[in-house]
Amino acid sequence: VRLRAGAVVKAADRSSLRGRFYCRGTEFASRGGSVVQEDGGGVAGWWHPLTRIGFRFGVGYFGGIGVAGVLGLVPILLAGVGVETGSVLHLSSLVRPPIEWTAAHVLGLRVTSAQVGSDSAFQWTGLFLLVVMSGVATGVWSVLDRGRVGYTRLFAWTQLYLRFVLALAMFYFGMAKAIPTQMPFVLNRLVEPYGNFSPEGVLWSQVSVSQPYEIALGAAELLAGVLLLVPRATAAGALLCAVDMTQVFLLNMTYDIRLKTVSSQFLLLSLFLLAPYARRLFAALFDGNPGPAIRTVPLFGSARANRIALAAQLAVGLGLLGVFGAQNWQQWSKETPDLYGIYRVDGFSSEGYARDPLLTDELRWRRVVIDRPFHVSDPMVLTIQHMDDSFEVYGGTIDPKRHIIDLHHRIALGTFEETPVRVRLTYWWPAPGRMVIDANDYAGHRIHTFFTEVDPKSFPLLERGFSWVQEQPYNR
């Protein structure tokens, strides 16, 4: 039967069209008695009505997630190259009024900040509104476009966009583990009582103790991101992302990490990208018969244009990977402070009078830990452990020529919020492995204290290496 696009089909012939057919290699579909050429052509594609509805919702919802994710990562990328990010960060304030109203009147939440990338009330409410808006948009789209039988070309561009969103996220989080800056080893964890740890602190410390494990976690996420850059490897990349994000989401839920919204959305996005391959994967895993390959739609009609598009995808993706790598390496390669280490207090006096090591003494120090900076702006972190095992954390600088320690910020435990302070300490070495610190004004007191340096490798957590042969368990 020869038909042309736009031709009207007689009522007696409409039932034989069965939704779609081909004419000289071009796909057509029947819509209300008219023959309409499918967009993009070249790929067979009558979609089930539920598939069309799910795709419409996915375009709206995950498209919004992608925009939010990109806007969240852009300031990080720009800050890494020294670009002011105030105008980008101002965008969140534009959507704050409707989010605050919805949080207060619909969800019963109180928005205290426009923080994104966390489990804040702002982000939970934003996700709720995105679900509602995507549902409404899906309904309107379904009514206005009820005659369409598939979205082959739109699917190709949507998949490209979402692949890059997910790959960008994998590069960001994966590189922070492959170059261990997300969960770095912190010296003061060696002297902090285990019961004082938060669940998040337990997980962070557990991962940081084994750098190979943390690097392996990051490598898996980076591999998933690289695979997502290659169209033919989309299924492999999405599957690996789904596995990675399932583990991350489980840890976030069981250790109460404030990234539940982020990890859950990346997991859902991975499954959305994997959905077109689900039937084939199921058949390959359980039937041993993968079936025919998925026929994809090219982005452009020209083979040359598609080759250029592929090269551009790889260039942009690998370029972003390099930027994240450079940023994390810059943070990781910061110089170790001159006084890096753990120091045990042997004697402490204030106003010239010695203070006995009583657990009730709120002024006396027990230990001082000087560590590398990871989540603060200063080049050195100094932690004071008091007799009751409470901690004061400061950020500051060390002048090794003048033997001066200047503390510039008081750092809140758990949040890393910085409060400006001005405390000056002087130090000197009376003997190898011994140090003396004086201060004319610490908490309103003139103090004098002397220390013995403690080797971090003397702790069981660090002295134990790797052993292939173990005759007895070593579970302390």
Spans of features found by a protein language model:
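Cytosolic-side transmembrane helix boundary signature
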Residues: 144, 148, 275-312
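Edge beta-strand at a domain terminus
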Residues: 333, 438-476
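Transmembrane alpha-helix/helix-exit interface in multi-pass inner-membrane proteins
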Residues: 167-191
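Alpha-helical transmembrane segments of multi-pass membrane proteins
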Residues: 63-78
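Membrane-interface segments at or immediately adjacent to transmembrane helices
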Residues: 313-404
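Individual transmembrane alpha-helix segments
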Residues: 105-133, 210-219
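Internal/C-terminal transmembrane anchor helices
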Residues: 164, 168, 298-331
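Hydrophobic alpha-helical segments
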Residues: 187-287
